């Protein structure tokens, strides 16, 4: 991919609140097309961002753009300073992208940050965007796996450290003598039970799968299994970065032709559980700090009571004969 353009701009958002509708920035020309970020509340609770290609209808058939994005969310008082770095592939089917924020920002917290200074207009803040746009050569085909998907797949296989690490070196079914065919997909013996279970529960999953090349079919199936394995991890092991990669993986398997609406719902459930876990951890941390302060206060009170007892005892001590005379 050849770098097409670089742009840095600032979007000032005014009067943002939980009741706000979608807020659109003025379109910004970057390369040969116009882009705009979109801000909106989710269920009146969370702050969310999107990036959209505005004039995609004027672009040639088969267009594609790869975007690297760096965002900084900041208020005038600088008490709010959040940085986001992400990337995404845009094409005719994907003209709007929900930017993955590492942690969902509760609007109540956002408003607290925005409103805490008397010198800042309520609900006003700015988003500083730095965008690099690359022209993508073609879109996903049978012989072209997207760079990001390939990178994640290779990383996943390397991290697993199992026998499927040699899979990418194999180019034909004849060389895959240790593989088993399941519904037209060559998989390892250890994966057969899982793949069969997927087809039993979701028989139409590969109805629209387009790839004929066996190497690509196998790679896509490994990618699907890796995504499912990610969702099976415990929340303690699952990071926000893992969920961002899971979003990318889901987009990839959908573009390859797998019907995975059921998996998308499961991913949303895991995201929701992760958010609840993080909120619970935050509340637990606050309670622990509060309890620690209470214990310190109790300790201080114990010392004060002990001191008062000593002083009271001294006060109650009767005077001796010598003291009186």
Swiss-Prot record:
Residues 6-131 form the MATH domain. This is MATH domain and coiled-coil domain-containing protein At3g58430. Keywords: Coiled coil. The lineage of its organism: Eukaryota, Viridiplantae, Streptophyta, Embryophyta, Tracheophyta. Residues 258-306 form a coiled coil. CDD domains: MATH. The keyword Coiled coil applies. Pfam families: MATH_2.
